[in-house]
Amino acid sequence: KVAIIGGGLSGLVLARNLDDSSKVTVFEKSSGVAGRMATRLVEPFEFDHGAQFFTARSEAFKNFLLPYLEKETVVAWNPKVVTLEEGKKPYKRPWFETHYIAQPRMTSLVKALGAPVDIRLNTKIDEVFKQDNSWSLKSAGKTIGEGFDWLISSAPGNQAFEIFNKSGITLKGLDEVEYSPCFALMVGLYSELSLGFDAAVVKNSPIKWIAANSTKYGRRKEKALVIHSCNKWAFEQMNEELPHVQSLLENELFKLTDVSAKDVSCIDMARWRYAKVERE
């Protein structure tokens, strides 16, 4: 028996690889799987507010993707990409390798992986302990799984450290993993607005990325924008209230594009504390 903490891509890939030889249970603290490959629905809009795309560089990962490419759960994304900078003319930014997305939303790949797996949602593991050569897990002070031969965490290093440290287990180096954060601003527009790009890399701004989510293959037609902040800027703003950060990013978006406040139908925010690994 194997227990895996975390229902993101890495946790569910591992679960599927072990599924033939072991009885696997995945424990996920959120209401759905996907982790940083998340999609948020704010009717009638949808936003891939986590990972925007992924690349495949190793032969192992390319082979892993083949069945999902055949089923079109994963497709190549070929957007018109530009570089934006306030006060300067945008210029085209070519991509020199294939970029992939899951469809009809980024969660689709992880959900396909997790379909045959025993997944316990809304289950935040806060303590683990070993007794008689088997592992047990606690959530909200109650034992919710026991008798596991192996325990594996795919959670961010800081979260895994908290779980194991509380349990009196020291894993060398786990508390030394460093992450940088990111804010995601999600903007739904009343109607079609010509931005002149499908995606933009932004320079010298609190914003580093803008994507017209609705231009991705298989997405809803409602015009939806996903804006990611710079990691360094996000770190500096990490303890600010979300409405304040939202206002700053919103104003920056208006400066960089033809979007204005009157175009905005809905707006939402997300705070990614563990967006990017800086040091392992």
Model-flagged regions — what are they?
Residues N17-V42:
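Glycine-rich FAD pyrophosphate-binding loop
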Residues A34, I144, F148-D198, V259:
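Central helical "cap/lid" subdomain
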Residues S247-L248, F254-E280:
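Flavin (FAD/FMN) cofactor-binding core of flavoprotein oxidoreductases
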Residues M186-M238, P243-D258:
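Active-site substrate-recognition segment that forms the wall
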Residues K1-V26:
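N-terminal Rossmann-like FAD-binding beta1-loop-alpha1 element of flavoenzymes
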Residues L121-W135:
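A conserved short coil-to-beta-strand element within the FAD-binding core of flavoproteins
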Residues T39-V82:
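N-terminal FAD cofactor-binding segment of flavoenzymes
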Residues F53-E59, K88-A112, N239-L248:
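Short beta-strand to alpha-helix junction loop
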